[in-house]
Amino acid sequence: MSSPAIGQPPIPPTPTDANISGKTVIVTGGNSGLGYEAARQFLTLGASRMILACRSIARGQEAASALRAHPTVKETNPNAVIDAFELDLDDYYSGLCFSNRVNAEVKELDILLNNGGQVVMGYEKSKSGHERSMQVNCYTHLLISLELFPLLRSTSAARGVPSRITFTGSATQIMQNTLSKQPISSESTVLGHFDDEANFNKLYRYADSKTVVNAYVRRLAALAPSEVIVNNACPGLVQTGIDKNLPFYLKLPMGLLRKSTGRTVEEGARTLIYVAVVAGTETNGKFLQHNQVDPLASTYTFAFPCYMERRPPECFSVSLEHGSKAQESLLAWNTSILRSFHGGGSAWRNTFNLALTI
C-alpha cells in the first residue's frame, strides 16, 4: 500500500467486498495516468469488460496489453475482455462515432468514467471550433454521457441496480474559477462566453472547465436518479503528468509539489473507484473530495450555477461544421432528448441536441 500524501487525508483501501464481476466499464483517457490506474483497479474488482477510450488507438492498444499482463489483473481477473476504442475529446464528431460504436457493439454498460482531460495554457480552438480545454474537459464528455445514457438506463433495469456516470473533477473549481468575478452576461451563452478569447485566463481556465463539469453533473443527476447515479470527484493533488503543458516556470514548482505532497496514482485512482463503485445514491449530483461529499459545490452562489438554472434551451445553440455544412445544435434539455431516454433510439443521427440545461 502506498504511503499517504503529506497534507492530504489518506484514502482508505477499497472495501474488500466491493465487486463488479460481470460488469462493463468505460474509462476515457484510459491509456495513462489516473485513467489507466482506475482501469486496473476496476479490473481487479472483477469487471468483465473494460473499454479504454483513447485519442491514439495505438497507445490504447498498448495500454490494453499492459493491463492484460499486469500481475494483479492476471491473478484476479485473467479472462477479462479489454478493448481500446478511439475517442478524440477535441472533436464532437469523434465523440459521436465513439458513442455509435459503443451502442452498436456493447449490450450492457454499468460504469462510464469521464476521466480524460488536459491543461491548456494558451488559447486554442478545438476541431469542433470551441476553446480547446472546455471542449476536451467538458463538452464532448457531456455528449457521450447523453449518447450512452439510454444504454446505462437499460443496463440498470436489467440488473436492478443503478448504473454510474462519474466525472473526474477538481477542487480548483471552488477557489480558482473566474466566474465569481466575471459572470456570464445575460446576453451571452455558455459556449459564447468561453469561446471568447477575451475571457480566457490561462491560469484559471482549467478551474473554469471543472466548474462547468460540476454544473453538468447536477443537471444530469436529475434525469433518472434511481437508475443512473451521476457524480463528480476530485482525486486531489496526484503525481501524474497533467502539468506537461505548463510553462517551465510553473512546471518545475508543480512537479516538486506533486512529488513531495501529491498522492500516488494508485491512491488518487481509489477516489474515483470509490465514487464509481462504492458510494451510493447519496452522492447523486454531488462533488466529492477525499471520499466525502463537499457541500460547497452544491451551494455556490456565484453566477454560473444560477445562470444554468434560469437559461432557456435556445441560449446554448451553436453552429458546427464537419464535412458537410450541417447545422448541429447544442440545446438544453430538449424534449426530444428526454423522449429518447424513455423510448430508445438516438436523437443525434443527423443533428445532435446536447441536453445542457444552460
UniProtKB/Swiss-Prot annotation:
Q: Which Gene3D superfamilies match?
A: NAD(P)-binding Rossmann-like Domain
Task: Give the SUPFAM superfamilies listed for this entry.
Answer: NAD(P)-binding Rossmann-fold domains
Hydrolase in keyword set = no
Q: What is its EC number?
A: 1.1.1.-
- List ligand-binding residues for NADP(+): 34, 88, 115, 206, 210, 238, 240
- Could you tell me which residues belong to the region Disordered? 1-22
Which pathway is this protein assigned to?
A: Secondary metabolite biosynthesis
Enzyme class, UniProt record, top EC level? oxidoreductase
Keywords, comma-separated and alphabetical: NADP, Oxidoreductase
MF annotations from Gene Ontology: oxidoreductase activity
Q: Does the keyword Repressor apply?
A: no
Which InterPro entries does this one have?
NAD(P)-bd_dom_sf, SDR_fam
Task: Give the annotated active site.
Answer: 206, 210
Q: Which Pfam families match?
A: adh_short
Name the family the entry cites. Belongs to the short-chain dehydrogenases/reductases (SDR) family.
What this chain does, per the entry, is described as: Short chain dehydrogenase; part of the SOR gene cluster that mediates the biosynthesis of sorbicillinoids, a diverse group of yellow secondary metabolites that restrict growth of competing pathogenic fungi but not of bacteria. Sorbicillinoids biosynthesis requires the action of two PKSs. The SOR cluster is required for the production of trichodimerol and dihydrotrichotetronin, with sor2 being sufficient for production of trichodimerol, but not dihydrotrichotetronin in the light.
Q: What is this protein called?
A: Short chain dehydrogenase sor7
Protein species of origin: Hypocrea jecorina (strain QM6a)
Taxonomic classification: Eukaryota, Fungi, Dikarya, Ascomycota, Pezizomycotina
